[in-house]
Regions:
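Gram-negative bacterial Sec-dependent N-terminal signal peptides
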Residues: 1-22
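Metallo-beta-lactamase
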Residues: 21-143, 147-159, 181-236, 253-260, 328, ...
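Active-site metal-binding loops of divalent metal-dependent hydrolases
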Residues: 59-60, 117-120, 156, 182-183, ...
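Active-site glycine- and acidic-residue-rich loops that bind
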Residues: 157, 233-247
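Short, conserved loop/helix-junction motifs that constitute active-site signature segments
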Residues: 168-173
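Cap/insert and terminal regions of metallo-dependent hydrolase folds
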Residues: 252-337
Length: 337
């Protein structure tokens, strides 16, 4: 008994001494205050797809709260928030998830193709940044706006389309814009009196952006599912908007799907792809598009480019045992010729 008490006493003394020693730093270097830089690397990231050069271009961020998903889910808001916290998703000053807005540039060697064009100078409470950063990212990546000859919007929401025009002038003067007929029917052709009050502002933004290109005959149309230009097939992913499309690129046996807004929050919708979002024009169709597309994407093991995935928005899908999906982002590596 005495031996046990002695052992406990010695252990306690050692713990006390150790804790006191660790409470104070061993060394204190002389202070050397250096101003923080508080800047980030330029907003682009590049990979090769066969012979095609693919560049992700950061345009800014939107603040998306779990409330936007709660009305389209069997999960409670608290459960949705838990999914977000589990992924350590960064938050904005207003408490929403800091959600990237990403466009993609594909240089095929024959054409310089921009998929989506960012928000430009459109103002909306969900946008974190006052102005889009697409052009700054594009120039940091070594390209100029006037070099782009083809623009493929996945749809005509402001964060994907308004960046084609700033203050009524074309940002991409030498580009032709290709729109699906299904998207055109709503955004460009619907009489204003037939639009809902909620839609009028968003439609006005889309029409203002398209106007200078329409005036100069720089807009062409296709049907969802068609090969839009050689080597680029449109993939119907309807629901988010009536003519929402992805675009599939293939080079030397490697394939990439640019899926636009198929997913808005990877923490929620990868685990529960049945969950829709308030921005969907037709949540039932959007849910169906996602549930149909994700298994096929995972099975084919193709590269994915997503507009609202964590930057650079490039990676692959794996099927999880619980029926959800795991997002596997690309890793940094140099471009080797």
């Amino acid at each position: 008994m005495k031996k046990t008490l002695l052992t406990l006493a010695i252990s306690a003394c050692i713990s006390f001494i150790t804790s006191n020693l660790s409470a104070h730093p061993v060394h204190i270097p002389a202070k050397n205050p250096v101003p923080m830089q508080l800047t980030q690397v330029p907003g682009y990231f590049r990979v090769m797809l066969g012979d095609f050069e693919v560049t992700a271009l950061y345009d800014g961020a939107a603040s998306l709260d779990s409330t936007l998903f709660a009305n389209y889910s069997k999960l409670s808001k608290a459960e949705l928030d838990t999914l977000i916290e589990h992924k350590f998703s960064p938050k904005t000053a207003t408490g929403g998830v800091d959600t990237a807005i990403i466009a993609f540039l594909v240089n095929t060697g024959d054409n310089l193709i921009l998929i989506d064009a960012g928000k430009g100078d459109v103002q909306d409470p969900i946008f974190v940044d006052e102005k889009g950063m697409l052009i700054a990212s594009l120039e940091a990546a070594g390209y100029k706006a006037e070099q782009i000859d083809t623009i493929l919007p996945t749809h005509m929401h402001a964060d994907h389309f308004s960046g084609v025009t700033v203050e009524g002038k074309k940002v991409f003067p030498n580009a032709t814009i290709y729109l699906s007929n299904q998207e055109k029917a709503f955004w460009l052709d619907t009489p204003e009196e037939k639009l809902s009050d909620n839609a009028k502002l968003f439609v006005a933004w889309a029409r203002e952006a398209a106007a200078p290109y329409l005036a100069d005959n720089q807009v062409k149309y296709y049907d969802s599912g068609e090969e839009v230009i050689p080597g680029v097939k449109s993939i119907p992913l309807h629901g988010h908007t009536l003519g929402h499309n992805g675009f599939e690129f293939t080079s030397k046996g490697e394939t990439m799907l640019v899926w636009g807004d198929l997913i808005h929050n990877h923490a929620i919708q990868m685990a529960h792809p049945e969950v829709a979002v308030d921005f969907d024009a037709d949540s039932i169709s959007a849910r169906k598009s996602r549930l149909n597309a994700l298994p096929e994407i995972a099975k084919r093991e193709i590269l994915v480019a997503g507009a609202h995935l964590p930057f650079p928005g490039l990676g692959h899908l794996r099927v999880e045992k619980d029926g959800g999906y795991r997002w596997i982002p690309v890793e940094y590596r140099p471009i080797r010729q």
